[in-house]
């Protein structure tokens, strides 16, 4: 703990009153004109860094005369040792060894109160205080009106209806719109003068008065253009209303702005802060009487094991901040609660629980009695749900539960790799022929399989991610161009070609096939790029039309496996890898309707 200079007796009394009975307090009485005082000063600083559960103070004898008189100081330096507000020892002169011996004699590494935090624990716990104000701003009626004004009218109308509403459907559409049309991810800026993308990390800057007042910016990242030395600023705004204007940021800005949109649609939410550097939301589903995980960055919901099982993170503390409560929700997002207890070593558990209880009480000021009872019942149900879900997860198994959980998708690949959030090496593949879901309803002789590049989902499980149903995949990525409002699959950066294939198990259909119709949208070639898609059945192969029309295969005989392969190659220059694409589609599509970027339709004979 750094050395603190005390300037008056009331200030010293305040420190003594707040100190734990076991806490050692050492006061260095000095004068600026005293040579030995200057000599011992850096050593005193070293002691303060070494002994965390002690308070090191300095008193200038020419300034704080009231303190000097209390302790009858007549020579400098003099060191007074206090414990439980009483003087327990004293050292006169700049005697390093004597000071060290007295510290060791009286020092206690832990507080007398088992629930009182040590200095290192206090430093760790400080991070949880700053988030408590975030959800309170969501209750501002002006902010909520601003939020509704930027959202699609149709979505607002569905959410604000007086009758029953499908909260999950509203959430899903809100996530999709927010991710694909409204908010953008900030990695590094592009220079407004020479259009060169900055390749270096930002420097820490100081927010201007305007950035602090209008946007609540607590810090600023400053970037210098590699080409023309232009300075670019990225203020880290905390005001969600300001984020409605800027519409860019990283996970903190995403979750903060999204939290305001949720409040504007009368969806009760929490702001979830994770000590391993991620932020997301939770929404209380009234129809299901439970809290639901929602991550606007990833455009996903109700997948709480995404971070541990998908990204490969080791979570420690996930704290949920509502407008009137603060709770620990870590158990919802982990695989093994017993293991978590052994890994939490930053703060003792009783200290953490005591701290969180006080923080929750402060957040709950002004609660009505009915609201207190409501939250108490919810919390009991939530804890029971977490325990039941963990037991259910273990029955399913670690491998199987990760079938539709991949690595992080927001941010550059380099950035995600540095953070260790890519998940398992390479995307997860089905790596076996697709067994089409059996038909339902009156169309018993018709099967359909499709992929939507906008939502990056398939029509049957495993649904999430373009690789989830692929048989083979090499050097292919999904790209969202927010500036052009387009999304597609293309090669990864470099010269190597890209390939992706899907195999369909036709033998398992157990019926003769009348015809197969295959359609692949958005096959695009630019400059010298090459894009080709072929379908192979038995001993023959056919090219898929590039104009989005269907390839129809009539009355296939003895069909067992249908193989569809897309190959991407060619291109030149820095963006050559993007000059061959499949599924190229405009992002701006309202209403959350699915698009058929890729479809396979099969009619069977009666």
UniProtKB/Swiss-Prot annotation:
Pfam families: PAW (PF04721), Thioredoxin (PF00085), Transglut_core (PF01841)
Gene3D superfamilies in UniProt: 2.20.25.10, 3.10.620.30, Glutaredoxin, Peptide N glycanase, PAW domain
Binding site for Zn(2+): 191, 194, 225, 228
Traits of the deletion mutant: Double knockout with rpt-5 RNAi results in failed expression of the proteasomal subunit rpt-3.
Enzyme Commission numbers on file: 3.5.1.52
A Gene Ontology cellular-component term: nucleus
Residue ranges of domain PAW in the record: 404-606
Keywords noted in UniProt: Cytoplasm, Endoplasmic reticulum, Hydrolase, Metal-binding, Zinc
Regulation: Inhibited by Zn(2+) and z-VAD-fmk (caspase inhibitor) but unaffected by EDTA.
Catalytic reaction list: Hydrolysis of an N(4)-(acetyl-beta-D-glucosaminyl)asparagine residue in which the glucosamine residue may be further glycosylated, to yield a (substituted) N-acetyl-beta-D-glucosaminylamine and a peptide containing an aspartate residue
EC class: hydrolase
Cofactor needs: Zn(2+)
Main location: cytoplasm
Active-site residues, record numbering mapped to chain: 251, 278, 295
Single Gene Ontology BP annotation: ERAD pathway
Purpose of the protein: Specifically deglycosylates the denatured form of N-linked glycoproteins in the cytoplasm and assists their proteasome-mediated degradation. Cleaves the beta-aspartyl-glucosamine (GlcNAc) of the glycan and the amide side chain of Asn, converting Asn to Asp. Prefers proteins containing high-mannose over those bearing complex type oligosaccharides. Can recognize misfolded proteins in the endoplasmic reticulum that are exported to the cytosol to be destroyed and deglycosylate them, while it has no activity toward native proteins.
Protein name: Peptide-N(4)-(N-acetyl-beta-glucosaminyl)asparagine amidase
Annotated source species: Caenorhabditis elegans
Gene name linked to the record: png-1
